[in-house]
Amino acid sequence: MKTEANYMQLCLGTVQFGLDYGITGQKKPPQEYAVECLDYATQNGILAIDTAAAYGTAEEVVGTFLAKKTIPRNKLFISTKLLHNILDECPPEDYKRVIQESLYRSLRRLHLDYI
């Protein structure tokens, strides 16, 4: 599926929603606050959201937001990333399977059918 959002001027990074640093100092914000931030950002034209499996619970937070919102999916640009060391202990013949499994886990956490 292709998103209608081909070019974004701003992208909201979500590492601060899932790890213990960022917008609240030394700890992650409550999920309700993070969802409010996502809602505010999207209502004000920030339709690109960046997250990652390595960002603690950030994918789950984004998923909670996306499950509650009525904004059309094709208006959003959601990006995520694999863990940096996902293939370290993996033989090359398993790369495809390991990457696919990781992406499917991200899709479940994000409540999406594509990224």
Labelled PLM ranges:
Residues 18-32, 82-100:
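Active-site mouth loops of central-metabolism enzymes
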Residues 43, 90-115:
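Glycine/proline-rich, positively charged
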Residues 1-76:
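N-terminal binding-site loop/beta-alpha segment at the start of enzyme catalytic domains
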Residues 78-80:
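Hydrophobic residues in well-ordered beta-strands that form the structural core
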